[in-house]
């Protein structure tokens, strides 16, 4: 019989999945779909699980997951509107994530070279305080649109399957299909040279 306690325990397993050798994400997806799906629709834990299940299916060739988030001035931006008709890099990062910031910095030359040829970058910072994002942008000099996800309000990281990470990069084509997940700058450059 499905209970909220059981659903909460299932959520806990999603947070430990990367370290588990006995349990796969497919196992958790199956348990959720077969036992809990639709049983606790108004509960925050169920909302988390729905997003987590969706995120487990993200792969190259899939359509990107749309979201809306504010910029530093509080103006709301919808990702699909910002990247429509362009090859786009969705850069999920955080001021406290050194590797994320190095990856973002490595994309600056590509942005400068291809921004007028149909390529764009939209960065989203995962922060507790907006000031942390603003300081990082000022220090690193990101020239592209930067949005902020405060306190995981929109669950963007969960939707993209990187809830336990500082960030990740997704390259999408003009139609919104994912071309690459966590590509290096060299891989992005090779794709851009072929497509633009």
Predicted segments, located by residue:
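Conserved segment of the thioredoxin-like fold in thiol-based oxidoreductases
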Residues: 112-156, 162-163
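Short, small/polar residue-rich loop motifs at catalytic or cofactor-binding pockets
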Residues: 63, 86, 164-166
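Oxidative protein folding and maturation machinery
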Residues: 1-78
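Conserved redox-active cysteine motifs that mediate thiol-disulfide chemistry
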Residues: 92-109
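Thiol/disulfide oxidoreductase modules built on the thioredoxin-like
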Residues: 140-142, 149-195
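Hydrophobic, well-ordered secondary-structure elements that form the walls
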Residues: 90, 133, 176
């Amino acid at each position: 019989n499905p209970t909220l306690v059981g659903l909460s325990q299932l959520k806990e397993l999603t947070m430990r999945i990367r370290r588990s050798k006995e349990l796969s994400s497919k196992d958790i997806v199956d348990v959720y779909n077969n036992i809990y799906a639709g049983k606790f629709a108004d509960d925050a834990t169920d909302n988390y699980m729905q997003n987590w299940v969706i995120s487990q299916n993200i792969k190259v060739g899939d359509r990107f997951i749309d979201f809306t988030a504010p910029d530093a001035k509080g103006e709301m931006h919808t990702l699909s509107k910002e990247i429509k008709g362009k090859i786009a890099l969705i850069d999920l990062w955080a001021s406290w994530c050194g590797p994320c910031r190095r990856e973002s910095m490595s994309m600056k030359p590509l942005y400068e070279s291809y921004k007028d040829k149909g390529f764009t970058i939209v960065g989203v910072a995962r922060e507790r305080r907006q000031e942390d994002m603003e300081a990082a942008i000022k220090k690193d000099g990101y020239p592209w649109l930067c949005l902020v996800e405060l306190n995981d309000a929109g669950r963007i990281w969960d939707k993209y399957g990187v809830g336990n990470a500082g960030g990740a990069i997704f390259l999408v084509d003009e139609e919104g299909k994912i071309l690459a997940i966590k590509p290096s700058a060299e891989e992005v450059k090779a794709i851009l040279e072929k497509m633009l």
